Structure formats: C-alpha cells, structure tokens
C-alpha cells in the first residue's frame, strides 16, 4: 500500500513538473496585442537591415509582394527585403488581432532613397511568422504631403473600454464598405458624417480633397478633365460620394479579406483586389445638380488594395487606403 501511494505521489509530482515546464511555453507562443505590434516593428527593422535571421519565421512561411505584373510569391529575403533603404518614418499605423494572431501596418519607408507606402500583414503560428503579405505603392508617393507626415489622431487612439466593439462587429462593418462600392449605395456601410478617406496619402473624400496632379508632359485629356470637373461637384461625404454612382467603373472587388480586427483601437484592416475590365463607357450619375453622367475610365487593370477603417460607436470615421497597379486579371496570391 505504501509503495502504491509513493508511486502515485511521484506521478503527481512528475505531472506538475511537466506542466510547469511546458505550460508557460505554450502560453508564450500566443502574442497579445503589444507583442504582435512589437513583432511587426522587429520585422520592419530586420528588413531595413536586410537580415531575415533577426525575426522568427516558420519553416513553411508564405510571402507575397506585388511586382510590376503579378502578385509574386517570394522567398523571405527577396523583394523589398533587398531594395528597402530606410524607414519607417513618423507615419506609422499598426493594428493587431490577438485572436487571429495577426498584425498589420501602413508605413512610409524608403526604397532606393525614394518614398514608398508599405502595407504589410504578418500572421503568427506558435510564435513564428507563418504568413507575410506586402502591398507596396511606388512612384506616386510624396512623403512631404501633410497627410503623410503623421497619421490622423483617430487612427492611433484607443477606443474607451466601455465603447469597444467585438471582432465580429468590426469585421462586418469593414466588409460593408466593399458592398457599398459595388452596390453604388453609400447607405450599405455605416459611415459617420465626418468620415474622411485618404488614398495613397491624398484626401479623396471628406476634408479638403486633393486632385491628382497631371504630369507636365501629359497631353490634354478632355474626358479626364470632365471627370475631374464632375468629381469636384460630388458630395464631399463618404456616403454621398458612393451613392452618386461615381464608382460604377469598378467591375468587382474580389477577393475581399478582413484580416485584422483590433478591438482596442477600433480598427478593421482589409486586403482586396479591385477589378476593372474597362467595358463601361459612361457612368450614370445620381443626385449631382447639372451632371447626369460622366465618362468611365477606359482602362483594364486590377488594383490590389489595403484599407484601414477606424470604427467608433458602430460608424466608420477614418479610412486610410493604399493601392497599386497590376494588369487586369492578376491574381491576389491568397
């Protein structure tokens, strides 16, 4: 009997020792919000130093980045890892999702000493980076813009604990933005009256809109000038602009993925592929006095995009978007 009790006691002690040895290690593999943000910052720092060994990658890590013609699947250490020359600057937005073990950022970096916008996503499995997604905007990024000096405060502020929404609500609201665009109806998404959208650093609705500047050598384009005139007359609200039908030239948005929901910051982050087949010639315009139609862009292209939505009290207040050109039909890689 004594021998049996002794064996039982030893077994219990061994079990406790095993739990002590492995329990904390298992827990340590799950990152909280700050841990995820730290991992992204470590990742960016390692990239600037061209040193992939400085961060932990899973053996089967998947890494994609947009090239000139396709969304490329690359070995870690290639792509922007080879060409980045500095950053990030003061313009840094982070969103982290402990439930999904995912983190995203939108930052200004330098590539060969020129400004670029980088939207990046990491997904961790057992504490190691298993997925990396880069979306890089090159050539049309002006880091001297006031809108790219630092993020809007709302994108950085915590939501008061009593007002925080759960992940499912943030994801649903973020996805509704794409429904509003393809449905040509701004009421499909819960936009705040003060909603302001920035695209590649330019204010596209809300605030003081900034029209893209034509290149000095560009030839006059009457249709483009007509579109710009019509855009200037559009309602300057997120809901109103969409409801006019000015985005009818978007053939589809597919896929659309809400990859990060940050309940502390009230941020939802989506990666998507805007598709434009160029078949629409004229877009009917609704609700704009003096304008009932406008020419549709006659271009076939895809526009891989990242959108960060700031959501408070169930409404979208800020949108920070990044997009880049790819040929029509390009696949997203995910």
Predicted regions and their residues:
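Bacterial N-terminal signal peptides
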Residues: 9-21
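C-terminal and inter-domain tail/linker signature
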Residues: 26-334
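Positively charged n-region of N-terminal signal peptides that target proteins for export
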Residues: 1-4
